[in-house]
């Protein structure tokens, strides 16, 4: 209790220091004071330390320096200091950045180190990090520390920060099948993810309604499965752009191709892939999940996932495995015959497991790891020990905290999404419901809790497209972002509300149409451009 009171006292003291400490997400350790330094936009620059492993030419940081300079001051020129009245003697016109290990051309991974320290005092203005990914997180924090007075002068307060994420996987899922999202919308989302220190873009590319992914091996999938094969697709170049744009912001791209269910859009492009449904003894003309009884199915999956494994460089692929409806399989006489030959009886979970086990073997043969939805675990599919289980069901078959207990007790790593479905909306400040979730509040040993590697906010697309995506995402997704980054003791709702309200105004200033948290105003309101 004493440590909790001390932590809250530190939070309260920091809050009283003013706008300079309205950070989101809140750092692990911070000391700040009222002493402030002026920044002159025309003079300010980011600079590599002479001993830094990263130097000019580092794509990740070179672009980040320009990006954050524009975010802080805009791209125009500012009045010269002598035109602004009194010249301030305490100035900070250089942020020195030092990175310990090289890696400017690499991709972020689950194991990437994102720690950083930020020191702003009379002697130095220094950002120190182990990796370029930590430097990116520190640059975002630095950008939020800078504030502008009513007279238009930029300041930053004396501050010391030691920061690191609580969880290594802090994700956001976008569904681009139920409604197509333009490429620009995805890129904009990646920007705001970086502002929130989220680091995994879970791209739910395809589903029953549409197949917008352009496969170079099976182009008919897109041609016959997308809403429009000209306007509503993601080309190979689009995918490359998303991956690189994300990389430059320290964000992994986790691509999901969900099977055997959620695959109706695959059928038109690959005849024979889906299971024909029967009405009595005759085909009904409708189709169900992928047909797991045919060798052709696995030949197709081998070729398709070989392509996917080469297109998406992250070590992990998301293979879905959720919500498989057995009705069509049960109606099909060929499926029934296959099950008899395999000795499955009438247990269709065994049939599902047979398909998924075969698919997992295919994907692992390409040197990939995989993430699956919780049904794969619930249905007792034999999976590799390094499989990551994503928990998404709130109460079925058990409460999601019980599910986390069971998954980790079995020795598997887990991701939590169940309480963080942002597409579900309600009147009032529902961000609080997301914020108060404690991912480790289940019965289990310390070893079990160490297997929870993070979580994801999910934005499913039944009722969300480009017209309402941004205000529904932000700042609500920020509540999940802080829960996954900050210390467990950073949990006071009043303190969170004050900072998130300020951050929402900062998002408006940055051109993000983030919805309000309650009654109030921002100095710079959002204007449609």
Curated annotation (Swiss-Prot):
Disulfide bonds join 58-104, 277-328, 505-522. This is Beta-hexosaminidase subunit alpha. Glycans are attached at residues 115, 157, 295. It catalyses: Hydrolysis of terminal non-reducing N-acetyl-D-hexosamine residues in N-acetyl-beta-D-hexosaminides; N-acetyl-beta-D-galactosaminyl-(1->4)-beta-D-3-sulfogalactosyl-(1->4)-beta-D-glucosyl-(1<->1')-ceramide + H2O = a beta-D-3-sulfogalactosyl-(1->4)-beta-D-glucosyl-(1<->1')-ceramide + N-acetyl-beta-D-galactosamine; a ganglioside GM2 (d18:1(4E)) + H2O = a ganglioside GM3 (d18:1(4E)) + N-acetyl-beta-D-galactosamine; a ganglioside GM2 + H2O = a ganglioside GM3 + N-acetyl-beta-D-galactosamine. GO terms for molecular function: beta-N-acetylhexosaminidase activity. It comes from the Eukaryota. Hydrolyzes the non-reducing end N-acetyl-D-hexosamine and/or sulfated N-acetyl-D-hexosamine of glycoconjugates, such as the oligosaccharide moieties from proteins and neutral glycolipids, or from certain mucopolysaccharides. The isozyme S is as active as the isozyme A on the anionic bis-sulfated glycans, the chondroitin-6-sulfate trisaccharide (C6S-3), and the dermatan sulfate pentasaccharide, and the sulfated glycosphingolipid SM2. The isozyme B does not hydrolyze each of these substrates, however hydrolyzes efficiently neutral oligosaccharide. Its main location: other. The gene is HEXA. Addition of GM2A stimulates the hydrolysis of sulfated glycosphingolipid SM2 and the ganglioside GM2. Keywords: Disulfide bond, Glycoprotein, Glycosidase, Hydrolase, Lipid metabolism, Lysosome, Signal, Zymogen. Its EC number is 3.2.1.52. It comes from Pongo abelii (Sumatran orangutan). Residues 23-88 form a propeptide. Residues 1-22 form the signal peptide. GO terms for cellular component: lysosome; membrane. PANTHER family: BETA-HEXOSAMINIDASE (PTHR22600), BETA-HEXOSAMINIDASE SUBUNIT ALPHA (PTHR22600:SF39).
């Amino acid at each position: 209790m004493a440590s909790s009171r001390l932590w809250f006292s530190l939070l309260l003291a920091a809050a009283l220091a003013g706008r300079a400490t309205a950070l989101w997400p809140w750092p692990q350790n911070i000391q700040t004071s009222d002493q402030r330094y002026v920044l002159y936009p025309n003079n300010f620059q980011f600079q590599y330390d002479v001993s830094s492993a990263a130097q000019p030419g580092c794509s990740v940081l070179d672009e980040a320096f320009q990006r954050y300079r524009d975010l802080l001051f805009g791209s125009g020129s500012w009045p010269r200091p002598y035109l602004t009245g009194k010249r301030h003697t305490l100035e900070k016109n250089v942020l020195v950045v030092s990175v310990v290990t090289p890696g400017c051309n690499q991709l972020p991974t689950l194991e990437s180190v994102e720690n950083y320290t930020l020191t702003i005092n009379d002697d130095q203005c220094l950002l120190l990090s182990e990796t370029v990914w930590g430097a990116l997180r520190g640059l975002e924090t630095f950008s939020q520390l800078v504030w502008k007075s009513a007279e238009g002068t930029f300041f930053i307060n004396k501050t010391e920060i030691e920061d690191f994420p609580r969880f290594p996987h802090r994700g956001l899922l976008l569904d681009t099948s139920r409604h197509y999202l333009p490429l620009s919308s995805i890129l904009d989302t990646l920007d705001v993810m970086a502002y929130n220190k989220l680091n995994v873009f879970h791209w739910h590319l395809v589903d029953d309604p549409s197949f917008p992914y352009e496969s170079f091996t099976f182009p008919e999938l897109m041609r016959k499965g997308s809403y429009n094969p000209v306007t509503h697709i993601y080309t190979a170049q689009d995918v490359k752009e998303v991956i690189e744009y994300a990389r430059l912001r320290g964000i992994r791209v986790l691509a999901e191709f969900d099977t055997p269910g959620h695959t109706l859009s695959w059928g038109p492009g690959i005849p024979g892939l889906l299971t024909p449904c029967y009405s009595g003894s005759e085909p009904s003309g409708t189709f169900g999940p992928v047909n797991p009884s045919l060798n052709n199915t696995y030949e197709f999956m081998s070729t398709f996932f070989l392509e996917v494994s080469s297109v998406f460089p992250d070590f992990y692929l998301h293979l879905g495995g959720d919500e498989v409806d057995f009705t069509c399989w049960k109606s099909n006489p060929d499926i029934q015959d296959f099950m008899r030959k395999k000795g499955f009886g009438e247990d269709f979970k065994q049939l599902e497991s047979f398909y998924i086990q075969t698919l997992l073997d295919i994907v692992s043969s390409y040197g990939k790891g995989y993430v699956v939805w919780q049904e794969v675990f619930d249905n007792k599919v034999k999976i590799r020990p390094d499989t990551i289980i994503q928990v998404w069901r709130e109460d079925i078959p058990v409460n999601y905290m019980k599910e986390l207990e069971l998954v980790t007790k079995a020795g598997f790593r887990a991701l939590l999404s169940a309480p963080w479905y942002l597409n579900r909306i309600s009147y009032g400040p529902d961000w609080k419901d997301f914020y108060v979730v404690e991912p480790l509040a289940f019965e289990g040993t310390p070893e079990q809790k160490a297997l929870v590697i993070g979580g994801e906010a999910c934005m499913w697309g039944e009722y969300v497209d480009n017209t309402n995506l941004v205000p529904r995402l932000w700042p609500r997704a920020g509540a999940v972002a802080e829960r996954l980054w900050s210390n467990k003791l950073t949990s006071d709702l009043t303190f969170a509300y004050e900072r998130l309200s300020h951050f929402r105004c900062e998002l408006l200033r940055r051109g993000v149409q983030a919805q309000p948290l309650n009654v109030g105003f921002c100095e710079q309101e959002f204007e449609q451009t």
